[in-house]
């Protein structure tokens, strides 16, 4: 399973699970509306959710990241998860994952952009 976690400031937001219509989350699945299903928040136990979010916050800080970013993970069937990368300039389009994650916790796109500007000053 593919998971992604947005960090804004120092806070991790709702985990998004990506379910592409192809075997892999390729360009077409990423940028064509309807080619992937996004489950937000991801269907994980509260314990797993909290651990992944805390680990993401720690990775974000440990890498020296600022303002916002998005961490990608693979989740194995046994519950182990593997950090893949930290995206320090994630997309902000209609199909992007950062706006989906923050919206799941009540933050509108407009407020997201304002927060990014505020944190960047």
Regions found by a protein language model. Give the residues of each.
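ATP-dependent carboxylate activation and anion-phosphoryl transfer catalytic cores
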Residues: 45-121
């Amino acid at each position: 399973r593919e998971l992604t976690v947005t960090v804004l400031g120092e806070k991790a937001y709702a985990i998004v699970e990506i379910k592409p219509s192809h075997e892999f989350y390729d360009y077409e699945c990423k940028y064509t509306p309807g080619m992937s299903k996004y489950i937000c928040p991801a269907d994980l136990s509260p314990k797993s959710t909290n651990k992944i979010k805390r680990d993401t916050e720690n990775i974000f800080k440990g890498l020296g990241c600022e303002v916002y970013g998005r961490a990608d993970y693979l989740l194995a069937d046994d519950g182990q998860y593997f950090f893949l990368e930290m995206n320090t300039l994630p997309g902000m389009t209609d199909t992007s994952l950062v706006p989906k994650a923050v919206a799941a916790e009540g933050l509108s796109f407009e407020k997201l952009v304002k927060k990014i500007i505020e944190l960047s000053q």
